[in-house]
């Protein structure tokens, strides 16, 4: 079945989703399985950059991921000693052997969990972390310890997602577009990016920065305010904006914001650059 035919079948199934269940067979089940396989292999992705440089979201692939929950039952699963789960989504590595891992070309250390339909490119290093279904992780990226990559999130090439950082998903609460981290970005420890925010090429988020769709991102030099995207090559830290005064005129509470303190320079890049030795 061509990708165009898959899209047509899944869009139609989505409109009739109340009638889809564990007993559903035939074209709908085959289309959903084919879509998940294409996401898993990287031949399709939930969002991709168009020729104009703008990101285009393939909503039908999100629908395929969601429909898979109606088509699948919970079952006992486990990939290693002492690991047993009960879920509808198998792990990506279920049944893999040495040759399969070598062909895939990435490293997954003990404790790394990746669900089926997430794509992991060659050269990626997965520390004990979690990558949810439908996500796409580009080559040379490091997902550090206890970091999470949410459902359908798009992570570019040579990105570093530091320990405990969180990249939000799209499935619950349902979001129109996935979080996108473009190439060569650095996401600091315990930082969070959610609600479809786009972090553009080469940006650096400091430790503990939280950015959602409504977070104000203030350029300290110009006063310009961005929302929903972090401009390319920005260095971003946590900050506050003055709040409205109380009725009696006393200062009100300040509100959280993110602050662009500068643009990435060689000094910054030397601190956040990837270590090629870890990717051999």
Curated annotation (Swiss-Prot):
It is an enzyme of class 2 (transferase). GO terms for cellular component: cytoplasm. Keywords: Acyltransferase, Amino-acid biosynthesis, Cytoplasm, Diaminopimelate biosynthesis, Lysine biosynthesis, Repeat, Transferase. Gene3D superfamilies: Hexapeptide repeat proteins, Tetrahydrodipicolinate-N-succinyltransferase, N-terminal domain. Substrate binds at residues 107, 144. One of its GO terms (molecular function) is 2,3,4,5-tetrahydropyridine-2,6-dicarboxylate N-succinyltransferase activity. Disulfide bonds: none annotated. Pathway: Amino-acid biosynthesis; L-lysine biosynthesis via DAP pathway; LL-2,6-diaminopimelate from (S)-tetrahydrodipicolinate (succinylase route): step 1/3. Its EC number is 2.3.1.117. It holds the Pfam family Hexapep_2. It catalyses: (S)-2,3,4,5-tetrahydrodipicolinate + succinyl-CoA + H2O = (S)-2-succinylamino-6-oxoheptanedioate + CoA. Its main location: cytoplasm. One of its GO terms (biological process) is diaminopimelate biosynthetic process. It is found in: Cytoplasm. Homotrimer. Belongs to the transferase hexapeptide repeat family. This is 2,3,4,5-tetrahydropyridine-2,6-dicarboxylate N-succinyltransferase.
């Amino acid at each position: 079945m061509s990708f165009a035919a898959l899209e047509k079948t899944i869009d139609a199934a989505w409109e009739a989703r109340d009638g889809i269940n564990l007993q559903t067979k035939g074209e709908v089940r085959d289309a959903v399985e084919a879509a998940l396989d294409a996401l898993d292999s990287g031949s399709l992705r939930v969002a991709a950059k168009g020729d104009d440089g703008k990101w285009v979201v393939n909503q039908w692939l999100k629908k395929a991921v969601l429909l898979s929950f109606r088509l699948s039952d919970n079952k006992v699963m486990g990939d290693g000693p002492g690991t047993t789960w009960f879920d509808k989504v198998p792990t990506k590595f279920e049944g893999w052997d040495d040759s399969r891992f070598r062909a895939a070309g990435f490293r997954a250390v003990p404790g790394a969990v990746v669900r089926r339909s997430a794509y992991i490119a060659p050269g990626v290093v997965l520390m004990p972390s979690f990558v949810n279904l439908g996500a796409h992780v580009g080559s040379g990226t490091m997902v550090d310890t206890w970091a999470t990559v949410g459902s359908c999130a798009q992570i570019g090439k040579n990105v570093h997602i530091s320990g405990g950082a969180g990249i939000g998903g799209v499935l619950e609460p349902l979001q129109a577009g996935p979080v996108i981290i473009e190439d060569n970005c650095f996401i600091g420890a315990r930082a969070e990016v959610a609600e479809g925010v786009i972090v553009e090429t080469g940006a650096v988020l400091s430790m503990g920065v939280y950015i959602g769709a409504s977070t104000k991102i203030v350029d300290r030099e110009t006063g310009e305010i961005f929302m929903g995207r972090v401009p390319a090559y920005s260095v971003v830290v946590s900050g506050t904006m003055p709040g409205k005064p109380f009725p009696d005129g006393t200062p009100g509470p300040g509100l959280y914001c993110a602050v662009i303190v500068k643009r990435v320079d060689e000094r910054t890049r030397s601190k956040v650059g990837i270590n090629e030795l870890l990717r051999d």
